[in-house]
A protein has these predicted regions:
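Conserved GNAT acetyl-CoA-binding A-motif
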Residues: 114, 121-133
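A short helix-loop-beta-strand connector motif used in the catalytic cores of GNAT acetyltransferases and
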Residues: 41-56, 73-77, 94
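Conserved beta-hairpin
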Residues: 51-68
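Conserved acyl-donor/pantetheine-binding loop and adjacent beta-alpha core of acyl/acetyltransferases
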Residues: 69-97, 105
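Conserved GNAT-fold acetyl-CoA-binding loop/helix
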Residues: 14, 18-44
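Conserved acetyl-CoA-binding loop-helix of GNAT-fold acetyltransferases
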Residues: 100, 106-119, 142
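A short beta-loop-alpha structural element at the N-terminal edge
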Residues: 1-15
């Protein structure tokens, strides 16, 4: 199930951030470009929660396996990009900081989060979806 996050979800979300960074350290593959202690952190999640744009994926028992910041905010650099599908800001939905617990990788959970975001964007009248990730993030770019 994918739903808006609550304050009770914050420790699990922060633990997933740390698990991803631990996984990157263990494998030597630093694909996210994230910096431990700088981004993302518990405070990052708190800010996104306060904005009302933090979503979580959970098992039937409520165990959090992933999160994302889903909104319509774009980095200023996006205005300079050469997009395959040009769009006005009002037409665009954006996924930021998509996370899946590394222990749950390969189960199609990120695709579930993206499908949820696409459906939500359509319901909001958005015509374009953008994924805020770096070009070096091969894992996310593969999605």
């Amino acid at each position: 199930m994918i739903r808006l996050a609550s304050e009770q979800d914050l420790p699990a979300i922060a633990a997933i951030y740390e698990a991803i960074l631990d996984h990157e350290d263990a494998t030597g593959l630093h694909y996210t470009g994230w910096q431990r202690g700088a981004y993302p952190t518990l405070d990052t999640a708190k800010g996104i929660l306060a904005a009302g744009t933090l979503y979580v994926g959970t098992d039937e028992d409520g165990m959090v396996w992933g999160s994302m910041n889903f909104n319509d905010w774009q980095l200023p650099e996006y205005a300079k990009g050469r997009w395959t599908i040009p769009a006005e800001d009002s037409e665009v939905a954006v996924i930021h900081t998509l996370t899946i617990d590394p222990k749950r990788a390969g189960q199609g959970l990120a695709r579930q989060m993206i499908a949820f975001a696409e459906d939500s964007a359509r319901k909001q009248g958005k015509t374009v979806m953008r994924f805020d990730t770096g070009t070096e993030n091969e894992v996310s770019n593969h999605l």
